[in-house]
Amino acid sequence: MQLKENGQKSLKQNNINKRFVYLISPNKIKGNEFYIDLEQVLNSKKVSFFQLRLKNETNRNMISIGKRIKKICKKYKVKFIINDNPIIAKKLNADGCHLGQNDMNILKAKKILKNKIIGVTCHNSLKLVQKAINDKVSYIALGAFYSTKTKKVKYKASIKILNLAKKITNIPIVAIGGIKLGNYKKLLLNKANFLAISSYIWNNKKYKPLKAILKLK
């Protein structure tokens, strides 16, 4: 499988990808400890994407943080994605951008980012999945499959919606929402291509980030 259809940037995929983690940043990034942890986590060779998602940060700080993260992602051959903001993604020359339903229009984002990766959140809606297919996105994010501490869950997704989406498209599916050690395998077995993970890695009270990701076999 390819990460792109009809002109969007591609990534090779296995039936169950060894690099199945779509890693999302913590809500705040301060100090050098995060960057040390990030190097170790990406070196695990389990991560395909890293998304920079900082909701309450200035553009200036986003660019400063993004430049540092981009170097680490490049070192470990991880695709660097910016959340919500195609303009920042372009300024950083990131690999792509992730868009929510209330963010910039996909076609407008494509004009800015050209052939870069553009993924979109479709919550639990097959109607939104079909629109994403028509818009020729790079990947489709579905969820939340489980409750999450990262953000309030407005849309609850089921394994059924994942199965239905897989039947109508070959565009890779990213499962999101509360994914951790106790529930991740069910999503992979139901053919989610990537798992978006954040709190389990960065806010785990039992394991440090490297140990947490190594637990995901």
Q: What is the predicted role of each segment?
A:
Residues 38-53, 135:
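Catalytic domains of carbohydrate-active enzymes, especially glycoside hydrolases
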Residues 41, 80-95, 124-137, 168-175, ...:
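Catalytic cores of alpha/beta
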Residues 49-112:
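N-terminal active-site wall of soluble small-molecule enzyme domains
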Residues 23, 99-109, 141-153, 178-216:
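Glycine-rich phosphate-binding active-site loops on the catalytic face of alpha/beta enzymes
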Residues 91-101, 120-167, 204-210:
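Glycine/Thr-rich beta-alpha phosphate-binding loop at enzyme active sites
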Residues 63-82, 108-125, 154-181, 213-217:
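Alpha-helix-loop-beta-strand connector modules within alpha/beta enzyme cores
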Residues 1-37:
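N-terminal amphipathic alpha-helix/helix-capping segment at the start of soluble metabolic enzymes
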Residues 19-25, 48-52, 80-82, 97-99, ...:
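Hydrophobic faces of well-ordered beta-strands that scaffold small-molecule active sites
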